[in-house]
Amino acid sequence: MSDTPPDRPVVLVHGLGGSAAETWQSNGWMDLIADAGRPVLGIDLLGHGTAPKPHDPEAYAALHQHVLDALPDEPVDAIGFSLGARTLLECAIEAPHRFARLVLTGVGANLFEEREDHHRIAEAIAGNADPTDPFSRYFTDLAQNPDGDADALRALLQRPGERLDPAQLDVVSMPVLVLLGDADFAGPADPLVEALPNATFRELRRCDHFATPRSMQCIDEALAFVDAAPF
């Protein structure tokens, strides 16, 4: 029998260019968690969805604070994808007592390294991408989404700040599940898993970065880890 309090909230944080509705609701996560009897909260990152969308990069300097401010008072189980996973890590570094368990999807060594991928994403959001490159075209399409705000996304990508340092993760001592696709450009997962004191890693089979939120393996592994599987 589970010892997870049935009223412990499950918090979901999406990636760049997404929203709680697009990433979690449309892929069934929120309904599954609710069917398991757990409270569920999808948080829109600053610059996305229903959140404010400032155009000043300085407004995004403490992106994680917007998430911390939206959290319930009690400790939560939290699941993040890509930028949402990084933001949850920053929250857990500052306030580890706010989290009982974390699931980090779509992140790995990219959290600690400056990569060409980051430049390609920024160029795509700015409208300067190679139209024949599927990777860049994905982010160009995000910027052109009529429900989004391309200027806000550009400001977010220009925000001040530095890459995470693995040593910062020493305080993230709660159980953490890292889920990364075998074809995800964010990998490998090893540097992230090794930096976390209490981490488990599961590789998502035949899964790239963009398919992660709709991967049935990802959904099953994540919900089982936070004890929010409906059956």
Go through the PLM ranges and name each one.
Residues R86-D130:
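Flexible "cap/lid" loop of the alpha/beta hydrolase fold
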Residues C207-I219:
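Catalytic histidine-centered segment of alpha/beta-hydrolase-like enzymes
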Residues V172, V178-L180:
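Short beta-strand/loop motif that positions the catalytic acidic residue
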Residues A183-P191:
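Conserved alpha/beta-hydrolase "acid-adjacent" motif
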Residues T140-A167:
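Hydrophobic, aromatic-rich cap/lid helix
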